């Protein structure tokens, strides 16, 4: 019969076996590589002189508790990483052995701390149950003990202690964070132009919908599908390009996707029927979506978290200004030439230029850069156990599906705070596309303007968005000041949305109130100024709010946002024209104004009560509030 003392002793021993691994290594000097006379071709193998020790890692601030992975950490591997700092830290040697991490107290990738505690509690519970039950049989008790022992043995660390994880070395020129500031900002501008190119492509046809009607002899609603289907493609493309980026890098994802996008503009221009055009436009959306789903990550790759806010603010300007250029440019193209194909040739030229330019941007994704470094070191040293943690774990299709598909859907049905935030982003994005079809009714039918002059009416939106860009820098400075005073909360990110929300609602009230023939065109056109200003501020602020609320699963939360935003952007154009004709110019605008006015409460309500709502309505708190030392 197994008594209580033996099980308690068993619990203690198993607990020690998990957390043991050895404080001997921490007392040793950095491990030496034995020089080798082997030659690889005409080159002697590289002899690395040292690797990091527990002491050196502790001096760099590493502790037993693994921090939360970076926002850009790979999503194609399991989540229980023992070295999540690998992709953001620099070490003097560039190599951190698994044995050293285990000596530091890090558990293996195969077992999480929570699982360890769960097993220990299970052992303790069984001990108490056996002490309380005098009628238990010996056989049952032995089975319990064997079950726990088996559970523990199955969860032993699986990583080879001789594996050495590669990191950037101190001051590493291949680390994007160490590139000259002007280079990083130049790449930020180029990548933002890539986003503008993609967003422009979605709305390029709105400046000449009548050319689609004339070309294929279809109605306006059928012609509008050429815009909506590309936006739907935006929502599905990230399912392809996010895993490609994780596995092979952002540069390759951009090169392949933008190349396909450029090529598929050719059948758009030459399609003999509407069906062919719609299929190709959808595929253009799928291929070009890499620009929308990866550029934010590329910019984050180049800037530390403390300084990336301004660069991300600049990026937030791009997806909302790109569509505005579509009717602005192609209104003149369609009126002057009456050729639908020329609109797509221009779009192809724009995409082709960006394809070539982006091809010259070096890889920015740290996991892939380190993977290349590890391969080089394996070749030069002959040590096959130098690798990244992503390589050591291998690709997890299960985790990839969770990150790209299952978790975004799970968040959509279980996170009301995320749903409300995404709904507001979706509303603003949808209203932008609604303007593309409301302005032709207001300025075309009321004032008698042609598409070229209607396109000019979008300039105020562009001006308002530019003004908002300057305000985002102000918001970022205020946030940095706050961070120096106290620990930030996700709600601190809502300052920009609180400024922009009233402007977005006011724009629609102005549009409705000034849509009369006896009022000069400046009245309804000025609504775009307020809308552009509020639109960019709301998107910038809520995007950061989502990241801080779901920091550990930010990519999945943002995927939820992209899907809902694209769905709204695709749907609104399909009924905007009919809504303005059925309700009238005033009440159609005011209906949207009522909705936008009600949504003003969201950033203010979340600012004051967001933390309480997240705790009450969310299944789990994923925010920066739960991260110690953040």
Swiss-Prot record:
GO terms for cellular component: fungal-type vacuole membrane; plasma membrane. The chain crosses the membrane at residues 190-210, 222-242, 252-272, 282-302, 312-332, 342-362, 423-443, 453-473, 494-514, 519-539, 553-575, 587-607. Keywords: Cell membrane, Glycoprotein, Membrane, Transmembrane, Transmembrane helix, Transport. The keyword 4Fe-4S does not apply. Residues 1-46, 107-157 are annotated as: Disordered. Glycans are attached at residue 135. InterPro entries: MFS (IPR011701), MFS_dom (IPR020846), MFS_trans_sf (IPR036259). It is found in: Cell membrane. Signal peptide: none annotated. Disruption phenotype: Increases the susceptibility to the imidazole antifungal drugs tioconazole, miconazole, clotrimazole and ketoconazole; to the triazole fluconazole; but not to the antifungals flucytosine or amphotericin B. Residues 37-46 have a biased composition (Basic and acidic residues). Gene3D superfamilies: MFS general substrate transporter like domains. Residues 1-35 have a biased composition (Polar residues). Induction: Expression is up-regulated under spermine stress and depends on the pleiotropic drug resistance transcription factor PDR1. This is Multidrug transporter TPO3.
């Amino acid at each position: 019969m197994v008594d209580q003392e033996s099980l308690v002793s068993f619990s203690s021993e198993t607990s020690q076996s998990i957390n043991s691994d050895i404080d001997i290594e921490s007392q040793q000097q950095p491990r030496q590589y034995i020089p080798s006379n082997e030659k690889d071709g005409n080159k002697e193998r590289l002899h690395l002189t040292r690797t990091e020790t527990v002491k050196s890692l502790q001096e760099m601030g590493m502790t037993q508790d693994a921090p939360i992975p970076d926002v850009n950490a790979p999503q194609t591997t399991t989540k229980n990483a023992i070295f999540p700092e690998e992709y953001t830290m620099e070490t003097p040697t560039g190599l951190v052995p698994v044995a050293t991490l285990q000596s530091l107290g890090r558990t293996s990738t195969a077992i999480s701390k929570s699982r360890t505690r769960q097993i220990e509690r299970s052992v303790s519970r069984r001990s108490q149950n056996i002490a309380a039950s005098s009628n238990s049989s010996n056989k049952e008790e032995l089975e319990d003990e064997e079950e726990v022992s088996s559970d523990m043995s199955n969860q032993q660390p699986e990583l080879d202690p001789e594996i050495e994880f590669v990191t950037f070395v101190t001051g590493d020129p291949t680390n994007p964070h160490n590139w000259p500031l002007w280079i990083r900002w130049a790449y930020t501008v180029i990548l933002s132009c890539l986003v503008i190119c993609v967003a422009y492509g979605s709305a390029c046809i709105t400046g000449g919908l009548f050319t689609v009607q004339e070309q294929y002899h279809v109605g306006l609603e059928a012609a509008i599908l050429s815009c909506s289907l590309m936006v739907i493609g935006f929502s599905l493309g990230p399912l392809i390009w996010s895993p490609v980026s994780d596995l092979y890098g952002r540069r390759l994802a951009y090169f392949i996707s933008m190349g396909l996008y450029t090529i598929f503009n050719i059948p758009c221009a030459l399609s003999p029927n509407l069906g062919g055009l719609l299929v190709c436009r959808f595929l253009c959306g799928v291929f070009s979506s890499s620009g929308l789903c990866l550029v934010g990550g590329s910019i984050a790759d180049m800037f530390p978290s403390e300084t990336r806010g301004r660069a991300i603010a600049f990026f937030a300007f791009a997806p909302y200004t790109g569509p505005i250029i579509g009717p602005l440019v192609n209104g003149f193209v369609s009126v002057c030439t009456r050729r639908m194909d020329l609109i797509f040739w221009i779009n192809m030229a724009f995409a082709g230029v960006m394809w070539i330019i982006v091809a010259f941007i070096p890889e920015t994704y740290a996991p892939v850069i380190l993977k290349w470094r590890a391969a080089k070191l394996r070749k030069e040293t002959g040590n096959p156990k130098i690798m990244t943690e992503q390589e050591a774990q291998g690709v997890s299709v299960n985790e990839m599906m969770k990150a790209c598909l299952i978790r975004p859907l799970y968040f959509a049905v279980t996170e009301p705070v995320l749903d409300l935030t995404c709904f507001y982003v979706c509303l603003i994005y949808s209203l932008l596309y609604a303007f593309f079809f409301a302005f032709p009714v207001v300025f075309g039918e009321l004032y008698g303007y042609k598409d070229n002059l209607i396109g000019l009416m979008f300039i105020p939106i562009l001006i308002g968005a530019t003004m908002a860009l300057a305000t985002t820098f102000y918001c970022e400075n205020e946030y940095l000041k706050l961070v120096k005073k106290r620990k930030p909360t996700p709600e601190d990110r809502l300052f920009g949305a609180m400024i922009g929300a009233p402007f977005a609602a006011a724009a629609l009230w102005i549009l409705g109130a000034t849509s009369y023939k006896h009022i000069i065109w400046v009245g309804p056109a000025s609504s775009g100024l307020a809308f552009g200003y509020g639109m960019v501020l709301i998107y910038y602020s809520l995007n950061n709010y989502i990241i801080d609320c779901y920091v550990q699963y930010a990519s999945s939360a943002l995927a939820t946002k992209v899907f809902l935003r694209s769905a709204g952007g695709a749907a609104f154009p399909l009924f905007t024209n009919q809504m303005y004709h059925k309700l009238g110019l005033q009440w159609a605008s005011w209906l949207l104004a009522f909705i936008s006015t009600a949504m003003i409460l969201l950033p203010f309500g979340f600012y004051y009560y967001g933390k309480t709502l997240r705790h009450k309505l969310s299944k789990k708190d994923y925010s920066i509030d739960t991260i110690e030392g953040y």
